[in-house]
């Protein structure tokens, strides 16, 4: 007895077209172009999830560096001083502290500076 494929192909196409919703023109209507576009989009999303972590780290370092240089200390000396002092604040917290609470950040800088 012959077994037909049934709804499998339709479900596969509908899944791709659902993912392509919001794309412009044929990229959201035509299966072939939608499949290519969705493949690209998923690849970009995967790549940029990794990239976002690197971007934020660069941003935090730039912010910490700018704030530390106002206290006449370099970023690397500041981080080394923190490590020697046993202060375990990460870059995200330090960058937020530098922006939202400059007086508190200056105390952290003082702790790092006295380790030099």
Swiss-Prot record:
An example Gene Ontology biological process: translation
CDD domains, A to Z: Ribosomal_L20
Alphabetized GO MF terms: rRNA binding; structural constituent of ribosome
InterPro entries to which the protein is assigned, alphabetical: Ribosomal_bL20, RIBOSOMAL_L20_CS, Ribosomal_protein_bL20_C
Keywords for the protein's UniProt record, in alphabetical order: Ribonucleoprotein, Ribosomal protein, RNA-binding, rRNA-binding
Disulfide linkage: none
Annotated GO CC locations: ribonucleoprotein complex; ribosome
Function field: Binds directly to 23S ribosomal RNA and is necessary for the in vitro assembly process of the 50S ribosomal subunit. It is not involved in the protein synthesizing functions of that subunit.
Family to which this protein belongs: Belongs to the bacterial ribosomal protein bL20 family.
HAMAP family for the chain: Ribosomal_bL20 (MF_00382)
Protein's name in the database: Large ribosomal subunit protein bL20
Organism: Desulfosudis oleivorans (strain DSM 6200 / JCM 39069 / Hxd3) (Desulfococcus oleovorans)
Lineage, top ranks: Bacteria, Pseudomonadati, Thermodesulfobacteriota, Desulfobacteria, Desulfobacterales
Gene behind the chain: rplT
